[in-house]
Every structure is written in C-alpha cells, then in structure tokens.
C-alpha cells in the first residue's frame, strides 16, 4: 500500500447504509429465468444502519502471481463484527457476498491491484430484518462502494451496479444512491426528482418468507407496464396519496399471511384523514408507512401521540438529501 493510501485510510470510515421505501410496487410479468419484472419508485431515507470500515495500514495481501479465488481472498481480507453481521455461515452474509462479488469482478477483468489491505467491518444495525426496507441489500451496496475506494479498484457506478445485481435485486438502488424509477428486476434505474417528505414508518414483529410471497397464487403478476415518462409525470398519484393504477401488489397477500402487518396498516389507515396521505406496505413487507403532509409533520405533540399509540415500533423519518 502506498503512503498516500495509508494516510487516507488511517482512520475508520463510517457510512450510513440507508433504508428505502417503495412508493408503489408492480409486477408486470415473470421472466424466463424465473425472476419477475417489476416497476417501482424507490425513495431513499436518511435513516438506516451504519457500517464502520477500519483499514489495516500494514496487513496486506499480495495479489501478484496469486491463484486465490475471490472467496479465498475474502476469508483472508475481511473481519466482520457486530451481532447482526455474523450469520451461521459467513459465506451466506450479504456483506461477505458483496466483497466476494467485487473481487470476482476485479479478477475477471484483470484489474486487481498488487496489494489489498485487510479490512475490519463493523455493522451497527438499526433496521429490522425482513421488513422490506432493504437493510441487507443496503449493507451490501455500502460494502461494495467503500471497498471499491479502499482497494482503489476504480470501478464506475455502472460497473458497481452490475456487480451489485449479482448479489441481490435491491442492491443496485443503494449503489445508485438516489431516488429512482426501477424496472427489470430492479437494476434498470432512472433518476426521479421528488419533493422532500416525512414518513411515519411502522415495523411490526412479523416476517413472511419472500419466496413464499412471490409464489403465492393470489399475487398479481400482470400489472400493465407504464413508461418512465408516465411514472415521472404522474408522481402526484403516488408520492402523498396512492391513486390507481398505482399500488403495491404484495399488500393483499402479506396482510393475509401476517396479521401483525394487517394491524399496523390498519392503524396507519386510521390516520390518513389527519395526514392527507395513503398508508401502504413497502417492498413485500413487513414494514408499512404513511407519508405525512408538511402541515402535520412539524406538530411534535401530535406525532409523538401517533408513535405512542402505534401497535408496534414506530419511527418518523425523512428522505435522504
């Protein structure tokens, strides 16, 4: 490692790993590869997990004439910490998978630097697992972005999005790093400008397996596709309220399978008249949210009552700026 790199990364790098909301979520068809084509608008939040990357200034691995695989490199280069960071098998961990995918791309493209520094990654977990907030995917994306800097791989955003898509369908949006219209399996991203917004987010203690939801016979998979231009022009139909054809196809399925999600959504629906917004599910659940009109978002006493009365853990969060 050169002196300037050692100096640049002598201290720990801390990054927000943000949550996301799906303002609507449509499935427009099933692909030949078994995945589903979708259309959604991702809204990134100023709330999430934090990842801390501590880089060793002297512990490096030489890549010269090395025959190590990306998997073997990861086992030598990474130390993962944090109660939620370690899974039964480290190779099933999304942070590990993200680093492995990044190194695999570097090996394939013959762009590995001569040395790679060892990195200690600590996950400070705040987002609940399996909530439709993108926590694990966001952790993976943050890992890809920061390790690309630390190891000076110099991959472009488009290349990193391609790498992220091999890790998970929601990873690309967090590499993209801004609100976007998403199509395909989530990797076809187009920037969209949205007004600043506050949200009341509820995270019921429920989790329904995503594969089970996608396989459910009552899941709608044939929503008529909309053009990017239409979605941009009709943003008023899904930003605050939710007007047909905009909806989340998972809502009837997940609320049927998970009563706690139904209860949380019902609670928010009871606040719609006061907030001038439409309550909805994000992703495939279990989290639900309600956009708040600016006139009520600043009413601290009222908002505190909503949080206190909620049937589960509740948060007030804003969009990422």
Regions found by a protein language model. Give the residues of each.
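Contiguous, small/hydrophobic- and glycine-enriched helical/loop subdomains that border
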Residues: 117, 140, 144-181
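Short, basic/glycine-rich phosphate-binding loops at helix/coil junctions
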Residues: 61, 68-88, 143, 165, ...
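Conserved glycine-rich phosphate/nucleotide-binding loop
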Residues: 1-16, 293-321
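Conserved, helical-rich catalytic subdomain that frames metal- and/or nucleotide-binding sites
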Residues: 174-176, 181-278, 303-304, 316-321
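ATP-binding N-lobe of GHMP and related small-molecule kinases
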Residues: 2-129, 149, 153-158, 203
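Short, conserved aromatic-histidine micro-motifs
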Residues: 62-66, 156-174, 303-321
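Glycine/serine-rich anion-binding loops at beta->alpha junctions
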Residues: 122-151, 278-292
């Amino acid at each position: 490692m050169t002196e300037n790199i050692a100096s640049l990364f002598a201290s720990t790098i801390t990054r927000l790993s943000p949550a996301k909301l799906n303002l609507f979520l449509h499935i427009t068809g099933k692909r030949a590869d078994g995945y589903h084509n979708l259309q959604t608008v991702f809204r990134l939040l100023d709330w999430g997990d934090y990842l801390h990357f501590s880089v060793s200034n002297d512990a490096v691995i030489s890549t010269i004439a090395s025959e190590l695989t990306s998997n073997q490199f990861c086992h030598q280069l990474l130390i993962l910490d944090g109660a939620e960071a370690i899974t039964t098998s480290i190779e099933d961990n999304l942070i590990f998978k993200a680093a492995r995918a990044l190194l695999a791309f570097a090996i394939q493209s013959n762009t590995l630097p001569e040395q790679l520094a060892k990195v200690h990654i600590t996950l400070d977990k705040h987002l609940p697992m399996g909530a439709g907030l993108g926590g694990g995917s966001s952790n993976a994306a943050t890992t890809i972005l920061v390790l690309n800097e630390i190891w000076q791989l110099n991959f472009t955003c488009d290349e990193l999005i391609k790498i992220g898509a091999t890790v998970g369908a929601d990873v690309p949006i967090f590499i993209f790093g801004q609100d976007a219209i998403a199509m395909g399996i989530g990797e076809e991203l187009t920037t969209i400008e949205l007004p600043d917004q506050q949200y009341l987010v509820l995270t019921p203690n429920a989790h329904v397996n995503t594969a089970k939801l996608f396989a459910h016979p009552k899941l709608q998979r044939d929503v008529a596709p909309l053009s990017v231009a239409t979605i941009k022009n009709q943003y008023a139909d899904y930003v605050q309220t939710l007007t047909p054809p905009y909806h989340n196809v998972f809502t009837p399925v997940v609320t049927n399978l998970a009563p706690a999600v139904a209860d949380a959504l019902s609670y928010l629906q009871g606040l719609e008249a006061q907030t001038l917004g439409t309550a909805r599910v994000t992703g495939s659940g279990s989290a639900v949210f309600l956009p708040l009109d600016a006139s009520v978002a600043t009413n601290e006493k009222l908002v505190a009552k909503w949080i206190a009365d909620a049937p589960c853990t509740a948060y007030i969060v804003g969009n990422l700026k």
